[in-house]
């Protein structure tokens, strides 16, 4: 059963029925443990910082009730919802990005599958109606092979947040083909091609909801949001990093996304908000994964402490603390 939707202020599409579609239903947690809803925000390569947070969930023995993700957060969220542990995600990421030449060859072998020549591929991507890289092919080259084909094959309910280009509204996907939904959530115009799905043209969900902690609608006791979208900052040495052309194209929209997050937090905040100190990394710094992991360790410990406090509070409300 699909959820009904309504629009508020012409800005976002929201669920109006109590509960979620059948494909995202999950039993309440047992005993005195609260249920957790985890929102993973967008931020390009900074999204690698989501992995230590997911490791923390495993270390605490917390199985999320539901996960939502935007852009890179959708990619990470789907992988975790498929049953891949945080530790295995770290290993996969390290293996993938430690071999720069191999990953580039792997990527372009997928891209060339749409045409028998690289020249043909470039010709297509320069066409105004087919901008740049096809996201589904990119994901097929980079994602772990364990991912199921559909949302229904996931072990944890998952919501992919996208933007309907023509309606200019949020569109949340919770069922059907998985890879196209993730590709749509991460389809940054000018970099990845928009995705046609459900009769809609979908682009990066960050344009309407870069930190989707408000899509759960009371589905869990504790809502945690991981914000990996800090704006450009000075490097570790205190000097400004002058962005490349691509970094300027990809990173400039982050200014608007951060504004959206700030305005959301003024009226509605998650129970737990974690912001790893990763502002000195650029959105395309995927090959700096080890440095991002290291920079995220403090946020991981902060998240664990926040979860433990939330569990204690929940037990006290039950009279068991």
State where each predicted segment sits:
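Patatin-like phospholipase
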Residues: 1-70, 78-321
């Amino acid at each position: 059963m699909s959820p009904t939707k309504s629009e508020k202020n012409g800005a976002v599409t929201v669920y109006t029925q109590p509960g979620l579609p059948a494909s995202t239903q999950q039993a309440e947690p047992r005993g005195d443990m609260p249920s957790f809803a985890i929102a993973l925000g967008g931020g390009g390569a900074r999204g690698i910082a989501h992995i230590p947070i997911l490791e923390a969930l495993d270390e605490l023995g917390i199985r999320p009730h539901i996960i939502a993700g935007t852009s890179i957060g959708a990619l990470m969220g789907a992988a975790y919802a498929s049953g891949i542990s945080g530790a295995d995600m770290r290993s996969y990421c390290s293996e993938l990005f430690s071999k720069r030449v191999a990953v580039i060859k792997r990527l372009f072998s997928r891209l060339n599958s749409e045409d028998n020549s690289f020249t043909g591929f470039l010709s297509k991507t320069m066409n105004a109606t087919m901008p740049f890289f096809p996201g589904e092919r990119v994901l097929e080259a980079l994602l772990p092979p364990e991912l199921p084909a559909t949302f229904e094959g996931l072990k944890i309910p998952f919501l992919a947040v996208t933007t309907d280009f023509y309606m200019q509204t949020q569109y949340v996907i919770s069922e059907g083909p998985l890879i196209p939904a993730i590709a749509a959530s991460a389809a940054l115009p000018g970099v990845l091609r928009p995705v046609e799905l459900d009769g809609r043209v979908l682009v990066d969900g960050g344009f309407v909801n870069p930190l989707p902690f408000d899509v759960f609608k009371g589905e869990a006791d504790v809502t945690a949001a991981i914000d990996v979208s800090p704006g450009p900052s000075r490097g570790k040495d205190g000097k400004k990093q002058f962005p490349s052309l691509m970094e300027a194209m990809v990173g400039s929209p982050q200014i608007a996304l951060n504004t959206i997050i700030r305005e959301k937090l003024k009226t509605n905040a998650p129970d737990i908000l974690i912001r790893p100190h990763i502002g000195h990394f650029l959105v395309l710094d995927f090959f700096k994964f080890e440095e991002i992991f290291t920079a995220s360790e403090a946020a991981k410990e902060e998240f664990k402490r926040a979860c433990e406090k939330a569990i204690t509070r929940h037990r006290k409300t039950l009279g068991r603390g």
